[in-house]
Amino acid sequence: MSLPATFDLTPEDAQLLLAANTHLGARNVQVHQEPYVFNTRPDGVNVINVGKTWEKIVLAARIIAAIPNPEDVCAISSRTYGQRAVLKFSAHTGATPIAGRFTPGSFTNYITRSFKEPRLIIVTDPRSDFQAIKEASYVNIPVIALTDLDSPSEYVDVAIPCNNRGKHSIGLVWYLLAREVLRLRGALVDRTQPWAIMPDLYFYRNPEEVEQQAAEETTSTGADAEESKEEVAEGQNEASEWAEENTEAVSW
């Protein structure tokens, strides 16, 4: 697929994809994923062509941007590593997120409270989100999926080849997809300027680590407050001593 020069993969984005291990695929290769294999390492790990990954990100972004109502796009992730990325993607693009367990019948049973009629769905893993893909096939909803080399491609219309097992890889692909959608919609006009949002915002964070970090910040804040109180008390003592000395001098 030939793209205009403005859609070419930049060295900065290529470095991001490599740093996030997006190019590290599975050892097994599904037949439809063979065109995306760059080479195979001696340890048996297949390397994904990041140029193909970028082309599919651009294609998926153009499909998403073509839908007039952003809420008609449904971003889905039942995998833990992709839930934060799905929520951030939806917050930035206006899509409808489904983070966590997908309720069966959400696309086919209009009686359920979670019933939705999206025009497009994006899933993080065809294996974990198989229920959403299956129901989408019943009601003719196009499917965009982040696929590894061994992922099933049945009922998937646009496959973005990437490492969909790593938390950094998943977050980065969702980040690049959101950025490209905003560029096509005109929210980000200048392609030469970096997006103000950092990719780290899309990465999964362990709740225990977040709580530990918050506790450390609270402890440091409390220590700083105690130090400031001690400094204030020392200043007050010095001021009172100085006032007493002046009072004695005046009385004398």
UniProtKB/Swiss-Prot annotation:
GO terms for biological process, alphabetical: ribosomal small subunit assembly; translation
CDD domains recorded: RPS2
Biased segments, Acidic residues type: 241-252
Keywords, comma-separated and alphabetical: Acetylation, Cytoplasm, Ribonucleoprotein, Ribosomal protein
SUPFAM superfamilies, alphabetized: Ribosomal protein S2
GO CC term, one of those recorded: cytosolic small ribosomal subunit
Subcellular location(s) per record: Cytoplasm
InterPro entries, A to Z: Ribosomal_uS2, Ribosomal_uS2_CS, Ribosomal_uS2_euk, Ribosomal_uS2_euk/arc, Ribosomal_uS2_flav_dom_sf
Subunit structure: Component of the small ribosomal subunit. Mature ribosomes consist of a small (40S) and a large (60S) subunit. The 40S subunit contains about 33 different proteins and 1 molecule of RNA (18S). The 60S subunit contains about 49 different proteins and 3 molecules of RNA (25S, 5.8S and 5S). Interacts with RPS21.
Family, as annotated: Belongs to the universal ribosomal protein uS2 family.
HAMAP family documented for this protein: Ribosomal_S2_euk
Name of the protein this chain belongs to: Small ribosomal subunit protein uS2A
This protein's encoding gene: RPS0A
